[in-house]
């Protein structure tokens, strides 16, 4: 009798366990809500009601090689495409990673540290905001005086500055006259359909989650500095001497690798226009970020490659590198191959 009872208990346990495992897997409530509202679908595709917010950024940025200070002004037209009323704006400035008080995923040297972002002026819909960005980490919160209603826009005007870090890792001072200027502007953080505002700090141990925005921006740099940036250079004739502007334009139409500026030409100071400062203008659309570098002695190569054989559309391929960086001599060639393969296979 006891044996039969034991057998029954084992069978009952197995049946109960199978029934338990057959239940629906755990799903966070915000994901369930997104499925229910049709912004996401279980096949991984955007739902029928999917949306993203969007920004149009118009920026004027200047880099002073003497003071190592980056300064800028920007106008952001921010589109709230959600059904939510936004009562706060979350501003992201990744370069505040260099502040001593910011959390980081590892130890850093003293040369990595800097004072971080200073906002000298902030207006939202022409309302003045007194925000002390010195209290921000890589993410700051602005409580709005007037909320941004669903399917409406808000205009932000920001003036800011920050020092380039002496230690070059992801960005900063590469040498005394070469700088990689990344994460250089305050931006509106992502507001999405299942997490709301992205308030997670950047700790130098992850990549980035950004809206896809449109950018028109300029970089002001001293004469003899070449600026290399995301997007299309809009004014080569205004910043380059005619011979070098012609070389760059030719590179847009050929598979041939051209030396836009070699070592001797950069040393001779004959590449850029000889105003005290040149303003380099760029445009990039539907992209998650923009960045730029500048140098008064880096070599500059360029070519292009067909990335759409139906329309014959070409993409520019460029490289800027120190004369000692012999591995980069083949950079344009290698990137031509990569772009061609991924575009046509």
Task: Place the predicted regions along the sequence by residue.
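Bacterial Sec-dependent N-terminal signal peptides
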Residues: 1-27
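N-terminal, polar/Ser/Thr-rich
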Residues: 22-71
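Short solvent-exposed strand-capping/beta-turn motif centered on an Asx-Ser/Thr pair
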Residues: 66, 79-83, 222-224
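A surface-exposed beta-strand-loop module
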Residues: 69, 79, 107-178, 263-278, ...
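Short, hydrophobic/aromatic-enriched beta-strand segments in well-ordered soluble domains
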Residues: 74-76, 91-93, 152-166, 215-223, ...
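Solvent-exposed beta-hairpin/edge-strand motifs
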Residues: 86-127, 182-185, 220-225
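Glycine/proline-rich low-complexity spacer/linker segments in large multi-domain proteins
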Residues: 101-113, 161-215, 235-237
